[in-house]
Amino acid sequence: AVVSVAGAVDGAGVAGQIDRLLVDETNVIVADFKTGARPSVTPADYHRQMALYAALLEQIYPDREVVTWLVWTEDRSVEEIDRAARDAALAALAPG
């Protein structure tokens, strides 16, 4: 089921719909489904989306590792957006 999330990241309001969310004792796994095949270069908007979801969930689950996946439906591939990519996406949002 889709999970709605809302909160603030670096003082900015954020709201979204997570396609699938799995929480266990050590991890929080976020999966977002994208139609089509995996592109050769993932759009920056998708990195930002997953970075913002992860930042919100890290506030809720500070003791768990947040893992973010893009699931491409056409070719059934999964792409993990790792912490470094998420951090870079958040840094690109910072003013100045």
Predicted regions and their residues:
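Structural signature of nuclease core domains in nucleic-acid processing machines
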Residues: 1-96
